[in-house]
A protein has these predicted regions:
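An aromatic- and histidine-rich active-site surface loop
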Residues: 14, 92-105, 182
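Nucleotide-sugar donor-binding catalytic core of glycosyltransferases
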Residues: 2-52, 69-75, 84, 119, ...
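Catalytic alpha-helical scaffold of carbohydrate-active enzymes acting on polysaccharides/glycoconjugates
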Residues: 78-82, 103-105, 124
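Active-site proximal beta-strand in glycosyltransferases
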Residues: 94, 106-121, 138-139
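Surface-exposed amphipathic alpha-helices with a cationic face
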Residues: 103-111, 190-194
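Short, structured active-site "lid" loops
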Residues: 51-65
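Short N-terminal targeting/anchoring amphipathic segment
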Residues: 80-97
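Internal alpha/beta domain cores that form substrate/cofactor-binding pockets in large enzymes
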Residues: 65-72, 100-102, 110
């Protein structure tokens, strides 16, 4: 029996897509990935670079590079879809990273459901609002974003390698970036966990100067 095909599109961040791709294969899917299409940008030629710089510096066109990137991304994905034809499903995480026209093109090549999961708050990447109608189902992480057009979904886990897992030594695990609108909540929880005797394995990415952000977090949180 032929395997169902699923197109996967999401950010390159921390290479979580590799785990998701492995898990989809574990559940019997053939995975078509378009993650690399948005991961790195390179000018296709010297003339394209010079033209873009001219638009930016002389014409003060701040969106010149973004438009070129969107154009190249679209063509790369169109070439891929024309080659493979139709897919059964499409799964996106943070579809705002893909141009609207690209999503419309993919929509025409999906046989069944096209789904997006917005694992960040809708306010953080507001461009996603204009893309909701392109999906059969649109899942959100933040309960504050629930509407008639969205469905709630929480964290997920990978079940392709659950054999012989060591017993965890920590009670809670978290990794994420420092964001001013959530640092207090994370710090308060870590203090509460310390009072309860819970062991945390928390890691906060703080860019090039982690020491500066130590004042925001207790010592039971690792900054990097």
């Amino acid at each position: 029996m032929n395997k169902k095909t699923i197109l996967l599109g999401m950010p390159f961040d921390n290479e979580i897509f590799r785990l998701i791709e492995t898990n989809l294969k574990y559940h019997g899917f053939d995975v078509v990935s378009i993650v690399d299409a948005t991961s790195q940008f390179r000018y296709p030629s010297l003339s394209a670079r010079l033209k873009t710089k001219f638009q930016q510096l002389i014409l003060n066109d701040r969106l010149a590079k973004s438009r070129l990137k969107a154009k190249l991304t679209k063509q790369k994905i169109i070439d891929l879809m024309d080659h493979i034809g139709e897919v059964d499903y499409a799964l996106f995480i943070r579809a705002d990273i893909y141009p609207h026209s690209v999503l419309e093109y993919i929509r025409k090549h999906v046989k069944f459901d096209m789904v997006n999961y917005q694992w960040d708050g809708m306010h953080r990447y507001p461009d996603i609002q204009s893309r909701i109608s392109l999906f059969d189902r649109f899942y959100i992480f933040d309960p504050a974003d629930i509407s008639s057009n969205t469905l709630p979904n929480t964290n997920f886990y990978f079940d392709y390698d659950l054999c012989n897992l060591p017993n965890p030594i920590n009670d809670f695990y978290f990794v994420g970036s420092h964001l001013p609108d959530r640092d207090i909540s994370i710090a308060n929880f870590s203090k509460f966990a310390q009072e309860k005797g819970w062991k945390l394995d928390f890691h906060i990415f703080c860019g090039s100067n982690p020491g500066f952000y130590r004042k925001f977090y207790p010592n039971n949180i690792n900054l990097f």
